[in-house]
Amino acid sequence: EKLLWSGAMPPFPGLGYPLVPGYEAVGEILEAPKGAYLKVGDLVFVPGSNGFVDAKGLFGGSARHLVTSVNRVTKINSEIGEKGVLYALAATARHALTGPDAKFPDLIIGHGALGRLLARITIIAGGKPPTVWEIDEKRTVGASGYEVVHPYDDIRNDYSSVFDASGRSDLLDDWIGHCAAGAEIVLAGFYADRINFAFPQAFMKEIKIRISAEWKQADM
């Protein structure tokens, strides 16, 4: 939504106007078919939709009432409430962590919502606590079981699995400089600008770059 608002959103399949904004939603079941495992009053997570008529939607789903297949929604604890929208971001983090030949990250770029979830899921799944880079002092708080540092204070150059959750497309040279030979960099954010990096350093280290998209139903 920020990129759409600022006009910086690059051409993307499904992008057009009129546009239904928003992504996932949390709501209360008002009506359910007979025999469904959900009942009226249940709180559910609702993924976005591409099923709008005469309108475009980049997974949009912002509406007072939604009609959806029972197989697409996920029942959540009522105590979670509106925070249940984070299920999508958590599933996106899991999707990045379970890619082909994926390894747990030992470095995460960015301590926003996705970066925090990547770090927490890594630890819960049995991985070693990763280092997280963050340049905004306000975002350095809230770490539990892992360390958040400013990249300028990190002298390591032996990271083997780097996950980017910042969406920055202009910093790959810095990340590669902190990598060991054969390291993998996972681009888990969304990038409005072209990805650029100097080839010689990446060539000498034989860096692998993997792109991770949004979550799939299996991740949920």
Segments and roles (model prediction):
Residues S6-N50, E79:
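Glycine-rich beta-strand-centered segment in the early N-terminal region that forms part
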Residues G14, V44-I109:
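NAD(P)H dinucleotide-binding glycine-rich loop of Rossmann-like/cofactor-binding domains
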Residues A192-M220:
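C-terminal substrate-binding/catalytic core of Rossmann-like NAD(P)-dependent dehydrogenases/reductases
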Residues G177-I195, I209-R210:
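ADP-ribose/adenylate-binding Rossmann-like module
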Residues I80-D153:
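Mid-domain Rossmann-like dinucleotide-binding core that forms the NAD(H)/NADP(H) cofactor-binding site
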Residues D136-R139, S169, A192-D193:
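Helix N-cap at the beta1-alpha1 junction of Rossmann-like dinucleotide-binding domains, i.e.
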Residues D154-V162:
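A short acidic, Gly/Pro-enriched loop at the edge of an enzyme's catalytic core
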Residues P100, S166, H178-A180:
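A generic alpha-to-beta junction signature in SAM-dependent methyltransferases
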